[in-house]
Amino acid sequence: MKTKQISIALPVTGENEWQAVREPIMSGWLTQGPKVAEFEKQFAKRHKANHALAVTSCTTGLHLILEALELGPGDEVILPAFTWVATANVVLYCGAKPVFVDVCSKTFNIDPTKIAEKVSSKTKAIIPVHLFGLCADMNAIKAAIPDHVKVVEDAACAAGANYQGRWAGTLGDAASFSFHPRKSITTGEGGMITTNDRELAEHM
């Protein structure tokens, strides 16, 4: 029996994208050139963030954020049980422990009503995932955690997403976006960190 592979999503590209790629190639400036700085500036502006830092992937961005927040062995990080494995991997990269919380059956985002029971004296951060571009219930999430717990948005799928009049990427202490081909915008691979915390941005 023949089987047909069904893609999660296909990137939409055309003449505009070709010209955008062609310009830096023809200039000879393929990495860390003026186009990167321009992209960071425009991405920050679009999401109303004070700082945007281009990275190689959303995973790299999440890892950088956790390192900048100085997470390490003995620390715990709360995250949803339904997410891409990278969300948990970056916690392990830092030597910290991922603590999983079940998700809502309607949104597939982390269930705020189940967070408080997973908070301990070792909890240093929470990583809400804005799954499939739908922002997690950030108000309820923040109400469920102590004030000292850092909020790191896994906004891999959430470029341009909005939550109660605020943009994804500005709903916590920092966020990381993905530009993988199945995301709403793509650079082939790549990612972006956003934050309104100047000191944190400089540390990264």
Predicted regions and their residues:
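Conserved core segment of the aminotransferase class I/II
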Residues: 181, 185-204
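Phosphate-binding glycine-rich loop
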Residues: 29-76, 87-94, 100-102, 166
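Conserved active-site segment immediately N-terminal to the catalytic lysine
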Residues: 150-186
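PLP-dependent aminotransferase-like
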Residues: 67-155, 162
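N-terminal "arm"/small-domain region of PLP-dependent enzymes with the aminotransferase-like
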Residues: 1-30, 34
